[in-house]
Design a protein with these regions (language model features):
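Conserved structural motif at the start of ABC-family nucleotide-binding domains
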Residues: 2, 19-23
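The feature captures the beta-strand-to-loop junction immediately N-terminal to the Walker
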Residues: 36-39
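Helix-to-loop junction immediately C-terminal to a conserved catalytic motif
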Residues: 51
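Conserved ABC transporter NBD signature motif
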Residues: 59-66, 112
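ABC ATPase NBD coupling module
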Residues: 67-82, 226
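Q-loop/switch helix immediately C-terminal to the Walker
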Residues: 87, 93-109
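Walker B catalytic motif
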Residues: 161-162, 169
Length: 246
């Protein structure tokens, strides 16, 4: 489905040039892929490169065999790639119902909108006609954003640290949402996360550190290393949902 060929991304500032991604080569076809690794390792940059928010300095991105490297985020969305920001965007003047309708590509009726909001643990009657603005908390915005991804139903859904700003009760509900997506949807889900409970439901785990792939394999092979048996720059501590980056 998705191929990254020799993807490199560099930025320049007053201190010179810095390489954020270094010759990344990946082929992604699994239903559920989790990316993890230390903060600043390049995970979010890689997600934005896939979504089309930023363009790689070098390399090529193929989606269903098509070279999408030069395509904008809008064009990639039309081809079936959706992206959930780590910090969701607020839309003054746009209601939750409007946002779900835009995501679904049609006018969402009350029943459909309620179903999507219920999936993420929100009471529809309290949110449908609310504006997606500063009156909503970060956790509420995050759950609404995930509801729009569900409504969109794309071939590839990319989530950048979806647990950020989510309280403990909501986090348990979030895991159920991803488990259901994994079990029922025909598309693929790509999640950037440090959380053991999310990594534990992935078909494949990829560790990104210092802009490069440091480990890549099935959960049974990679997760024990992340839990402390092998130093790959970032360990996920079992049972604590915390990362220890070195």
């Amino acid at each position: 489905m998705l191929q990254l060929e020799h993807v490199t991304y560099r930025v320049s500032d007053e201190q010179g040039e810095k390489t954020i991604l270094k010759d990344v080569n990946l082929s992604l076809s699994e239903r559920f892929v989790a990316f993890t690794g230390p903060n600043g390792g390049g995970k979010s940059t890689l997600a934005k490169v896939i979504a089309g928010i930023i363009t790689p300095t070098e390399g090529k991105i193929l989606f269903d065999g098509e070279d999408i490297t030069p395509l904008s985020v809008t064009e990639r969305a039309k081809r079936g790639i959706s992206y959930a920001f780590q910090q969701p965007v607020r839309f003054k003047g746009l209601t939750v119902r409007d946002l779900i309708s835009i995501a679904a590509g049609r006018s969402a009726n009350v029943s459909d909108a309620c179903a999507y909001l219920s999936e993420v643990g929100l009471c529809a009657r309290d949110y449908l006609d609310r504006e997606v603005n500063a009156s909503l908390s970060g956790g509420e915005l995050k759950r609404i954003e995930i509801a729009t991804i569900l409504a969109r139903g794309t071939k590839l859904s990319v989530f950048d640290e979806p647990e950020a700003g989510i309280d403990l009760w909501s986090f348990g509900n979030l895991i159920k949402v991803f488990e259901k997506m994994h079990a029922e949807l025909g598309g693929s889900v790509m999640i950037i996360s440090h959380q053991e409970r999310i990594l534990n439901i992935a078909d494949r785990i990829i560790v990104i550190s210092a802009g490069s792939v440091k480990a890549d394999g099935v959960k049974a092979d990679v997760l024990p290393a992340l839990l402390g048996t092998l130093d790959m720059g970032c360990r996920v501590t079992a049972g604590s949902d915390k990362e220890d980056c070195i």
